[in-house]
A protein has these predicted regions:
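A short, aliphatic-rich alpha-helical micro-motif
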Residues: 68-69
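NAD(P)+-binding Rossmann beta1-loop-alpha1 motif at the extreme N-terminus of oxidoreductases
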Residues: 1-53, 61-63
Length: 69
């Protein structure tokens, strides 16, 4: 298992992050929007880009690029 950073929380970034967690990796995703980060971390969803998809607990988000990396 590796720790992976995904830069961007749009549909592609969120789908990639989800796929990586499903395959056993811990993923920290960078997002520029604080409300998106809160939604991902608190509700484990990103309804704007992947409606109806529950994101894994191993996927977290931050607005801090250094923290993501």
């Amino acid at each position: 298992m590796k720790k992976v950073a995904v830069i961007g929380s749009g549909s592609w970034g969120t789908a990639l992050a989800q796929m990586l967690t499903v395959h056993g990796h811990t993923v920290r995703m960078w997002a520029r929007n604080a409300s998106t980060v809160a939604e991902i971390n608190e509700r484990h969803t990103n309804e704007k880009y992947l409606p109806g998809i529950l994101l894994p607990q191993a996927l977290t988000a931050t607005t801090d690029r250094a923290e993501a990396l």
